[in-house]
Amino acid sequence: MELLPHEKQVVEYEKTIAEFKEKNKKNSLLSSSEIQKLERRLDKLKEKIYSDLTPWERVQICRHPSRPRSVNYIEGMCEEFVELCGDRTFRDDPAVVGGLAKINGQRFMLIGQEKGCDTSSRMHRNFGMLCPEGFRKALRLAKMAEKFGLPIVFLVDTPGAFPGLTAEARGQGWAIANNLFQLARLKTPIIVLVIGEGCSGGALGMAIGDVIAMLEHSYYSVISPEGCASILWKDPKKNSEAAAMLKMHGEDLKQFAIVDVVIKEPVGGAHHNPSAVYRDVQNFILQEWLRLKDLSIEDLLEKRYQKFRTIGLYETSSESGPEA
């Protein structure tokens, strides 16, 4: 597993404890109570390091190569999954994985953005950067879900929509805008979960829903920290400052009413205990579905409209009183 800078001290401590345990099998250098004392120190070290992460360190956790991706969530949560491909206009976009899923006996249309796990798969998936056909594919499956009365689950994990000339020529901006328009009026419950990177319009095109959730170390932003640093300071190395200024993580976005729920991750990030994350995400999806399924279509659409209508409202103080 690739090590992040803040993880090195923890890993060295873990190796030391493992070596003591191995040697103890032969020579009993340390008593079990002494080893337990070392393990408690390790727990305190982890708590200290991971409770005081900078926004940029959390971005690094979010981008960790071993972090669970959409296909991992499908394998970890679904009893059944039948993949559906193509946009019926141009081609299939491998950056989107979607299909009919069964989670704890309940059927969903599950649609996720997929980056890939190694060099060849990342190139095949275009590093999770959707082309117009990817957004059309997601919308096609969403409309199919509406037709058959299935709730929709979107898993968001993208560094952004593909900015290439070919994508622009095929109507990238229109494809994203059309998704926003169509998903806002779709007559079925929509649950959105940001599992990794949620960057710019690439994320937004699959993030219109009745409830928006994020994993603890995922981020949701109009731009990447590097892109922001390049624009503001003409220096992509100022990514740490940009990450702090963007307020891109769940606790800040929840205060702004952009996201509704922040799901905690295992200590160190989702890649340290994927099965626990799959369980928590599955429980969240089922819990929200039980809440949303009792709403009438009229109430569902009105609440969805009001949710996005009120994002961005703020109050200022004046001599005559607060103004919106």
UniProtKB/Swiss-Prot annotation:
Cellular localisation: Cytoplasm
EC number(s) from the headed UniProt entry: 2.1.3.15
SUPFAM superfamilies: ClpP/crotonase
MF terms in GO: acetyl-CoA carboxylase activity; ATP binding; carboxyl- or carbamoyltransferase activity
Annotated organism of origin: Chlamydia felis (strain Fe/C-56)
Source organism, top-level taxon: Bacteria
GO terms classed as biological process: fatty acid biosynthetic process; malonyl-CoA biosynthetic process
Domain CoA carboxyltransferase C-terminal: start-end pairs: 37-291
Protein name per the record: Acetyl-coenzyme A carboxylase carboxyl transferase subunit alpha
Alphabetically ordered keywords of this record: ATP-binding, Cytoplasm, Fatty acid biosynthesis, Fatty acid metabolism, Lipid biosynthesis, Lipid metabolism, Nucleotide-binding, Transferase
Subunit field text: Acetyl-CoA carboxylase is a heterohexamer composed of biotin carboxyl carrier protein (AccB), biotin carboxylase (AccC) and two subunits each of ACCase subunit alpha (AccA) and ACCase subunit beta (AccD).
InterPro entries on file: Acetyl_CoA_COase_a_su, ClpP/crotonase-like_dom_sf, COA_CT_C
Reactions the enzyme catalyzes: N(6)-carboxybiotinyl-L-lysyl-[protein] + acetyl-CoA = N(6)-biotinyl-L-lysyl-[protein] + malonyl-CoA
Function of the molecule: Component of the acetyl coenzyme A carboxylase (ACC) complex. First, biotin carboxylase catalyzes the carboxylation of biotin on its carrier protein (BCCP) and then the CO(2) group is transferred by the carboxyltransferase to acetyl-CoA to form malonyl-CoA.
Biological pathway: Lipid metabolism; malonyl-CoA biosynthesis; malonyl-CoA from acetyl-CoA: step 1/1
Annotated family: Belongs to the AccA family.
GO cellular component, one term: acetyl-CoA carboxylase complex
